[in-house]
């Protein structure tokens, strides 16, 4: 947000959407005490619970036969990788066959990237509009700071929604620098896994957590 008024609007939206979530995953950092105190009706879990490849019975197996909408910057790569889904997690039911997969290109404003929108909320509204035009049962969202409000929008319009954030790309066998030496994730890599398509980078990606997602 470029000014105090927009920042205040952003914070109020985030508090509202966090308080309305059915389930929140925690990083186990001190400031989360405020989240726990402020979300009376919310259940909490460990962060890894959102990442199905850690578990012998992955929650994502329940996506089988569902119409799934993904909101993520790596649209082209996700669609290509889904075609190789049986090769991504051999012997594990992490990415089952879906009734259909729709991917909406998430707006990327990271690293000072120009989004082409007047402000953050204009970009959010446009992504919500695209979601409303899609036919889906479940939304999986990995769209940076837009993720929580977009997941709430999916829920509020009658759909199931899971905010996987940065880990969304792993569900589709997409490598990222942050996981290259990870003791668990790096061992999931196989020849079917790829880096994001070169068209899906940003000019200042090294400013985004050291280029973690590429």
Protein language model features and the residues they cover:
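Gly/Ser/Thr-rich loops at beta-strand to alpha-helix junctions
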Residues: 29-32, 73-77, 140-149, 165-169
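Short coil/turn segments at beta-strand junctions that form active-site/ligand-binding loops
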Residues: 66, 135-137, 159
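C-terminal functional extensions of proteins
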Residues: 149-214
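Alpha-helix C-cap/termination motif
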Residues: 17, 133-134, 157
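Glycine-rich phosphate-binding "P-loop"
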Residues: 37-44, 102-126
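Electropositive, gly/pro-rich neighborhoods at or near active sites that engage anionic ligands
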Residues: 1-97
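Mobile, glycine- and charge-enriched loop segments
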Residues: 60, 67-116, 189-191, 200-214
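A short, acidic, amphipathic alpha-helical segment used as a generic capping/interface helix at domain edges
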Residues: 9, 122-135, 146-148
């Amino acid at each position: 947000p470029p000014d105090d008024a927009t920042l205040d609007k952003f914070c109020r939206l985030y508090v509202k959407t966090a308080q309305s979530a059915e389930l929140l995953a925690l990083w186990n950092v001190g400031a989360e005490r405020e989240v726990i105190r402020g979300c009376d009706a919310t259940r909490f879990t460990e962060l890894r619970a959102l990442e199905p490849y850690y578990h012998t019975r992955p929650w994502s197996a329940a996506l089988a036969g569902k119409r799934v909408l993904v909101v993520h910057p790596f649209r082209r790569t996700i669609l290509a990788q889904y075609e190789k889904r049986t090769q991504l997690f051999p012997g594990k039911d992490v990415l089952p066959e879906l009734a259909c997969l729709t991917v909406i290109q998430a707006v990327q404003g990271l690293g000072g990237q120009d989004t082409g929108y007047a402000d953050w909320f204009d970009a959010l509204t446009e992504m919500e509009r695209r979601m409303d035009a899609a036919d889906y049962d479940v939304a999986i969202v990995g769209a940076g700071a837009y993720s929580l409000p977009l997941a709430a929008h999916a829920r509020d319009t009658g759909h199931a929604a899971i905010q996987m954030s940065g880990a969304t790309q792993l569900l589709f066998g997409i490598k990222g620098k942050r996981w290259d030496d990870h003791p668990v994730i790096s061992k999931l890599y196989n020849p079917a896994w790829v880096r994001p398509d070169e068209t899906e980078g940003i000019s200042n990606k090294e400013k985004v957590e050291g280029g973690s997602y590429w």
